[in-house]
Amino acid sequence: MSSGGLLLLLGLLTLWAELTPISGHDRPKFCYLPADPGECLAHMRSFYYDSESKKCKEFIYGGCHGNANKFPSRDKCRQTCGGK
């Protein structure tokens, strides 16, 4: 296969991976953790996946500790955990 064909295949696979919805079986376990603002006093706009509503929601992160269910953007939350 030519290098152009390989690039096209790679591009199509990447697009497919981005557009394929995440099922509950593929979702990382930390997506089911509750929002945890942590113990520090920073005021950082963050997002977490709410497994009950199946949506990425905004919360304020304090800047330290907390858990892995926090994302810098709604898009990153959706890419990792799915949701709306």
Swiss-Prot record:
Keywords: Disulfide bond, Protease inhibitor, Secreted, Serine protease inhibitor, Signal. Belongs to the venom Kunitz-type family. Serine protease inhibitor that has activity against chymotrypsin (Ki=4.77 nM) but not against trypsin. SMART domains: KU. GO terms for molecular function: serine-type endopeptidase inhibitor activity. PROSITE patterns: BPTI_KUNITZ_1, BPTI_KUNITZ_2. Gene3D superfamilies: Pancreatic trypsin inhibitor Kunitz domain. Expressed by the venom gland. Disulfide bonds join 31-81, 40-64, 56-77. This is Kunitz-type serine protease inhibitor B1. Residues 1-24 form the signal peptide. The record marks 41-42 as: Reactive bond for chymotrypsin. One of its GO terms (cellular component) is extracellular space. Pfam families: Kunitz_BPTI. Residues 31-81 form the BPTI/Kunitz inhibitor domain. It is found in: Secreted. PANTHER family: KUNITZ-TYPE PROTEASE INHIBITOR-RELATED, SERINE PEPTIDASE INHIBITOR, KUNITZ TYPE, 3. InterPro entries: Kunitz_BPTI, Kunitz_BPTI_sf, Prtase_inh_Kunz-CS, TFPI/VKTCI-like.
